[in-house]
């Protein structure tokens, strides 16, 4: 895909941006690549690399959900910037081989292209929820299976010793 801003869109901490009018939130993301199909639709492409024993052929693990949300956010950003974007994006997964005798100054990869049909319909309501949470004086309830909530509670307990005069719940992070 040829576009004058392509290098900016690939750059971390710049990327493609969109200010959400209903919330005023600035959403941005740095895309890895963009392919174009015969219908002139853009396909968002995200490169991933790892070194796992098993062959990667699908994004079917719980921790892949973040990858999918990232793809859908990129699709949403390009749509909001006026581009015709296909629902299908691609993950190009490079899995470094572990079974070589020696590296000999090079890594060998098995590369798999994984199509993914994105659905960015969750993004608008999520931005509204984020705005509401940011403007609230209350922390959201801890979710049962949320790794971030567990981390927040752990950090809160550690930080409590720096605020000994405050009762639990009187500060940020739930401390």
Which role does the model predict for each range below?
Residues 1-13, 20:
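A non-catalytic, helix-rich entry segment at domain boundaries
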Residues 2, 69-70, 75, 144, ...:
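Residue-identity detector for glutamine
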Residues 123, 128-175:
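Cysteine-cluster motifs in flexible loop/terminal segments that predominantly coordinate metals
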Residues 2-4, 87-93, 163-170:
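Short alpha-helical "patches" and their helix-cap loops
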Residues 1, 20-29, 145-155:
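Short secondary-structure boundary segments
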């Amino acid at each position: 895909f040829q576009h004058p801003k392509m290098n900016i869109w690939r750059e971390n901490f710049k990327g493609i941006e969109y200010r959400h009018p209903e919330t005023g939130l600035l959403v941005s993301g740095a895309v890895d690549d963009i392919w174009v199909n015969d219908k002139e639709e853009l396909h968002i492409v995200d490169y991933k690399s790892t070194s796992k024993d098993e062959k990667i052929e699908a994004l079917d693990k719980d921790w892949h959900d973040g990858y999918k949300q990232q793809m859908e956010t990129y699709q949403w950003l390009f749509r909001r910037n006026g581009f015709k974007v296909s629902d299908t994006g691609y993950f190009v997964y490079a899995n470094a081989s572990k079974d070589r005798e020696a590296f000999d100054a090079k890594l060998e990869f098995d590369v798999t292209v994984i199509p993914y049909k994105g659905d960015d319909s969750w993004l608008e309501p999520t931005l509204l929820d984020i705005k509401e949470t940011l403007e609230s004086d209350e922390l959201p309830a801890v979710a049962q299976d949320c790794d971030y909530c567990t981390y927040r509670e752990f950090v809160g307990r550690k930080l409590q010793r720096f605020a000994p005069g405050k009762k639990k719940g009187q500060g940020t992070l739930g401390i």
